[in-house]
Amino acid sequence: MEKRDYYEVLGLTKDEIKKAYRKLSKQYHPDLNKEPGADEKFKEIAEAYEVLSDDQKKARYDQFGHEDPNAGFGGGFGGGGFGGFEDIFSSFFGGGGRRQDPNAPRKGDDLQYRMNIKFEEAIFGKETEIEIPKDETCETCHGSGAKPGTQPETCSTCNGAGQINQAVDTPFGRMMNRRSCTTCHGTGKIIKEKCSTCRGEGKVQKRKKIKVSIPAGVDDGQQIRVSGQGEPGINGGPAGDLYIMFRVQGHNDFERDGDDIYFELKLTFPQAALGDEIEVPTVHGKVKLRIPAGTQSGAQFRLKDKGVKNVHGYGMGNQYVTVKVMTPEKLTEKQKQLLREFAEISGDIPEEQGSSLFDKIKKKFQGE
């Protein structure tokens, strides 16, 4: 679905954005605002306006945010939040220009959980269950934080707005600097009698069991989203989401690269030279593989569709079998004699076996 223009969505013109930029830049200019962090806020405002005023930059931000467009799946947490920069955009789009209702429903925070899974579980998928610590809305006060039978009172400092205005004299005239109310910490409410269960927090931590469907073909570092299993919402808002990142354990015999699996097949010299038909293990069971005569070490064979099912449903990967010809470390006298005969027939006679360096030097001096 094509994204609509920010200005069209919000009913704002570019002139109005420019006015908002001028207002915010004056409000947070380091020469005018001495509060900690004002200089960083000023830089973010300038950066945000630079993006909004350039159609190409705005289009890239719409699509990728601050993430590298070349990054792989699962590179970011939830593919989302842009931190303070997003707050600046909110200011341009009316969030900073108008008072936000601190009592309005807000979505809860997202959670992230790392889950270790076996090699085979990642390939074939699995239905399982995890238990995680997470905050839940307090059942005693139903999230208000107040003792049952009482209600939070409106903050008298900010009159429930959650923010207060501070007049600042500047060379441009008197300006109003808006900041979070320090009395109610931006909530707009004061809890005089706190709930004994949650101690005024409105939420309690519990251990919750959650069913998880591991998708077949998931790879190390990829993640899935479990909707509504994050932190509880605020003021009746929806719960956040749970992002599960998978850490896939290695395997003794197989190596995985994307949807393909690699296996090293060890062959004896006779098998490689004469050829053979052997059973090769795959994650789907054993299959027969014909080894042609004269196969060299490093030769590779493909077993079609014996790899991993693509997690997005785009077919199956393959298994690649790489040959490694093993050289015997210990030989009997009979085996040595046969190899010498083979070498003579091949015209490739090796140096005399069994002679030490001292014996070779001695024979040299004796003219032998």
From Swiss-Prot:
GO BP: chaperone cofactor-dependent protein refolding; DNA replication; protein refolding; response to heat
Residues reported to bind Zn(2+) 1: C138, C141, C195, C198
Keywords, ordered alphabetically: Chaperone, Cytoplasm, DNA replication, Metal-binding, Repeat, Stress response, Zinc, Zinc-finger
Keyword Zinc-finger: yes
Residue span(s) of domain J: 5-65
Main location class: cytoplasm
GO MF: ATP binding; heat shock protein binding; unfolded protein binding; zinc ion binding
Recorded GO CC terms: cytoplasm
InterPro entries recorded: DnaJ, DnaJ_C, DnaJ_domain, DnaJ_domain_CS, HSP40/DnaJ_pept-bd, HSP_DnaJ_Cys-rich_dom, HSP_DnaJ_Cys-rich_dom_sf, J_dom_sf
Zinc fingers classed as CR-type: ranges: 125-207
Keyword Metal-binding found: yes
Superkingdom of the organism of origin: Bacteria
Cofactor annotation: Zn(2+)
Co-factor note (free text): Binds 2 Zn(2+) ions per monomer.
Localization of this protein: Cytoplasm
Pfam families: DnaJ (PF00226), DnaJ_C (PF01556), DnaJ_CXXCXGXG (PF00684)
Family: Belongs to the DnaJ family.
Domain notes: The J domain is necessary and sufficient to stimulate DnaK ATPase activity. Zinc center 1 plays an important role in the autonomous, DnaK-independent chaperone activity of DnaJ. Zinc center 2 is essential for interaction with DnaK and for DnaJ activity.
HAMAP family: DnaJ
Name the UniProt record assigns to this protein: Chaperone protein DnaJ
Name of the gene this protein is made from: dnaJ
